[in-house]
Amino acid sequence: MCGGAIIHHLKGHPEGSRRATEGLLWPEKKKPRWGGGGRRHFGGFVEEDDEDFEADFEEFEVDSGDSDLELGEEDDDDVVEIKPAAFKRALSRDNLSTITTAGFDGPAAKSAKRKRKNQFRGIRQRPWGKWAAEIRDPRKGVRVWLGTFNSAEEAARAYDAEARRIRGKKAKVNFPEAPTTAQKRRAGSTTAKAPKSSVEQKPTVKPAFNNLANANAFVYPSANFTSNKPFVQPDNMPFVPAMNSAAPIEDPIINSDQGSNSFGCSDFGWENDTKTPDITSIAPISTIAEVDESAFIKSSTNPMVPPVMENSAVDLPDLEPYMRFLLDDGAGDSIDSLLNLDGSQDVVSNMDLWSFDDMPVSDFY
C-alpha cells in the first residue's frame, strides 16, 4: 500500500513487445557528417537515394583542393602564378550536378602561365641592385655562397662553374655552350705562350800562369772564341805575352820533394823559430814553349827584342862560396852535406867546454 504508487510504472512489458532499435529512437533521416581523414560517418543504417550519393561524391571531388597536376618539385627560384578556378554548379532535369569551369583551360595553359622570377638559375638580386649567386652542395648539405656580382650574367656564369664542379656533366647550367668556348680559349692561350729559352753564354774566367817569374803578373779572363768581340787590354797593366789559341791552358804543377820535408832539429831550440818544407811550383813546358811571336817587344833599334824576365832561376852551386860557415873542422865541407844532414846531430859533444883550470891564476891571494 505504501509503495505501490511509486513502482507501479516499473511493471514489465508483455513478452510479445518488440525491442527498441535506432529506427525507433531516431526516426528522422540523419545527414552524413565529416570526420577525420576525409571519411564520412553515417548516424544510422538508413537507405540513401542513389542520386543524392552521386551528388555528394562529386561535391567531395570539387572541394578536395588542387589537382595532381599542380603538385611537383619546384625550384627556389620559380614562382607559380595560378588563378583559383571558379566553379559553377548547374542542376539538370534529373537533379544531377554538372560541373562547368570558368577560367581553366587545362595543364597547357597553366604551364604557359608559369613564370620564372629570375632569368638565370641560382642567382637573386639584392635590394641595392647587386646580384648574388649561391648553390646547394649535396655532399655538405649546405648552401655555398659564391659572391656578389655587378650583373646577372656574371653571377650566372659563377653558378655554372660551381655547378659543373659539383655535379659534372649532369649539372643544370644557364649557359650550356660555355665549356666549349672556355676550352678553346685555354688551348689558344697555351699555344700562344711558347717557352722562350734565351741563355746568354758568358765567357769563362781562367787564370793564365804563363809568366810565373813575374809575381805581379796580371790575371786576365780567357776570351770566348765563339764571340766576335775583340779582347781589349786595359791600361796600366804589366805585359802578358799572348798565348796560342790552339794550345790548351794547363794548371801549374806543384812538386814537393820528400827529402826536403825533413826538419832540422837540435837540443837547444827556440819556440819562435819556424821551419817549413821547400815547395816549388813548376809551370808546364807546353805553355812556355808555345809562345806567339807577339810576345816579343818591338823597339826602334832592334826589330825583335825578347822580354826581360825578372827573378830568373839561379843555381845553388854558384852561391856555394858565399854560404860557407865558420865552423871548426868543417870550413871546407860542402853545403850539400849540410842540406843532406850528413853532419852529426850531437852538437854538444863537438864543442869544447871551458873549465876553471884554464883560467889564469892571479897573485892577489
UniProtKB/Swiss-Prot annotation:
GO terms for cellular component: nucleus. Disulfide bonds: none annotated. Coiled coil: none annotated. InterPro entries: AP2/ERF_dom (IPR001471), AP2/ERF_dom_sf (IPR036955), DNA-bd_dom_sf (IPR016177), ERF_plant (IPR044808). One of its GO terms (molecular function) is DNA binding. It comes from the Eukaryota. Phosphorylated in vitro by MPK12/BWMK1. GO terms for biological process: defense response; ethylene-activated signaling pathway. It is found in: Nucleus. Residues 176-202 are annotated as: Disordered. The keyword Cell wall biogenesis/degradation does not apply. The keyword Phosphoprotein applies. CDD domains: AP2. Keywords: Activator, DNA-binding, Nucleus, Phosphoprotein, Plant defense, Transcription, Transcription regulation. Residues 119-176 bind DNA. SUPFAM superfamilies: DNA-binding domain. The AP2/ERF domain binds specifically to the 5'-GCCGCC-3' motif. The affinity of this binding is higher if the seventh amino-acid of this domain is basic. Interacts with MPK12/BWMK1. Probable transcriptional activator that may be involved in defense signaling pathway. Binds in vitro to the DNA sequence 5'-AGCCGCC-3' of the GCC-box element found in pathogenesis-related (PR) gene promoters. The transcriptional activation is enhanced in vitro by the presence of MPK12/BWMK1. Belongs to the ethylene-response factor family. Class 1 subfamily. PANTHER family: DNA-BINDING DOMAIN, ETHYLENE-RESPONSIVE TRANSCRIPTION FACTOR 1. This is Ethylene-responsive transcription factor 1. It comes from Oryza sativa subsp. japonica. The gene is EREBP1.
